[in-house]
């Protein structure tokens, strides 16, 4: 009976993770469709996402915790929100999401640089392959805007990796509190741009920003927070890869934006490298757990 209940929870968690990744993937197309400054978009998107997460926190009866383990990752998450939207405005949606998807590689690099963790052979191979993939993105569009967009997307990936390290083994209430801090950071940062750029207020952009805040950012983070409790790490990694695969597809279908050939090749290298590395790490963890149990 316990096994059946656990499997049901695990299956539900995997479904929630898949829904989460699918909803995350609609970011690129809606960011492209809103004719506003990127900082305005990230601010208002975070406002609606924050209200969504706050409502969930209240329903669940969670406390909002402000300490080092929520403020530091929250600040980094806020930078991710800001940089990701800016990257989507500066470069292609495919470049923006795939280059941000490099965050696990930055976790390895930061852990080695700042915490003295030693590289395993597979870590070294994954880092090299990922950076080869990243390099491919810079062979396609050499205009100043695209180059800047690529660097901003890589910065978002680095901040996301740093966020996961700073978050550590935070409890559920701390994870949701960090999300709120991140959304507050992005909103406060964008306030001056809302005032100075005076974005055109019309029905479609307002509808799109609400969709971005509630459906693309707020609800997926709630789903992710729920799924993380029961979804196996390997399944999370594989299902999470749905986002960078679907994101450019929606933009191609609804906006006609096509990534370049080298970007496509680089994207495949990055996604495969990160996913295979995550699978190998998950199998090692499962093997270690089995040895401890025996």
Regions picked out by a protein language model, each given a short descriptive name:
Residues 1-40, 75, 83, 142-169, ...:
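Glycine-/small-residue-enriched transmembrane alpha-helix faces in small-molecule transporters
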Residues 60-95, 99-100, 132-136, 213-231:
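Specific transmembrane alpha-helical segments of multi-pass solute transporters/efflux pumps
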């Amino acid at each position: 009976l316990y096994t059946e209940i656990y499997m049901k929870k695990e299956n539900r968690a995997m479904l929630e993770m898949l829904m989460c990744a699918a909803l995350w993937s609609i970011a690129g197309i809606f960011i492209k469709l809103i004719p506003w400054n990127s900082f305005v978009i990230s601010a208002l998107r975070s406002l609606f996402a924050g209200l969504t997460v706050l409502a969930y926190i209240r329903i669940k009866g969670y406390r909002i915790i402000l300490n080092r383990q929520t403020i530091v990752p929250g600040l980094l998450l806020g930078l991710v929100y800001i940089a990701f939207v800016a990257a989507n405005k500066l470069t292609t949606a495919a470049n923006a999401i795939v280059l941000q998807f490099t965050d696990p590689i930055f976790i390895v690099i930061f852990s080695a640089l700042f915490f003295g963790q030693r590289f395993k052979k597979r870590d070294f191979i994954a880092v090299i392959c990922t950076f080869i993939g990243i390099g491919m993105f810079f062979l396609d569009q050499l205009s100043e805007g695209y180059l800047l967009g690529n660097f901003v997307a890589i910065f978002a990936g680095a901040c996301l990796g740093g966020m996961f390290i700073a978050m550590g083994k935070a409890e559920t209430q701390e994870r949701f509190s960090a999300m709120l801090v991140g959304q507050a950071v992005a909103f406060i940062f964008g306030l001056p741009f809302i005032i100075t750029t005076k974005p055109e207020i019309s029905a479609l952009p307002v509808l799109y920003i609400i969709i971005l805040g509630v459906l693309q950012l707020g609800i997926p983070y709630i789903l992710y927070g729920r799924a993380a409790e029961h979804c196996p790490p390997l399944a999370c990694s594989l299902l999470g890869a749905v986002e960078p695969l679907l994101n450019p597809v929606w933009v191609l279908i609804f906006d006609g934006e096509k990534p370049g050939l080298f970007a496509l090749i680089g994207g495949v290298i990055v996604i495969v490298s990160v996913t295979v590395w995550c699978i190998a790490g998950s199998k090692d963890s499962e093997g270690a757990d089995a040895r401890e149990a025996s």
